[in-house]
Amino acid sequence: MSLGRRRFLAAGLGMTPLAALLSACGSRGDWPEGMQEIKWDRDTCVRCTMAISDRRFAGEMRGGPKNTVFKFDDVGCAVLWVRDKLKDFPWMADPETRFWVADLRSRGGEVKWLDARRAQYLTKTSPMGYNFGAVALPEPGTMDFAEMRAHVLAKGK
């Protein structure tokens, strides 16, 4: 083997860790199976068009024959979107439709995602003023999805 070829092979082997590191930079992170990545501060809420910035209140719905995705900055926007658009997207009422909300207690860049219909909700100031944040388990002052939904629908907007 010539000296030039050895250098070429050695350089290629030396670049392998760098290539692995760079490929990790484009990874999807800890998104649940089937959830489309939310691009923070760039993606907008399908209902109010506000940028999705506060990770503690974000949500996403995915389903239907085309696996359509809707992203939300506030669970209240999601509730009202379903009310307003159910005729256009009847699959949103299907229990098979996936619906995620961020855990209110998520910190930093790490977001824990919850099934919106199984989560519990605390009263907490939220981006659009519907004032509910999701937590995983019942605790004093929480309500289930149906009760939170009723409050949002009563408030309207």
Describe the role of every protein-language-model region.
Residues M1-T16:
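N-terminal secretory signal peptides and thylakoid transit peptides that target proteins
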Residues G29-D88:
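N-terminal secretory signal peptides
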Residues V69-W113:
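Mature extracytoplasmic domains of secretory-pathway proteins
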Residues T97-K157:
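Beta-strand-rich cores of mature extracytoplasmic or soluble domains
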Residues S23-A24:
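C-terminal motif of bacterial Sec signal peptides marking the signal peptidase cleavage site
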Residues M15, D84-K85, K155:
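Alpha-helix boundary/capping residues
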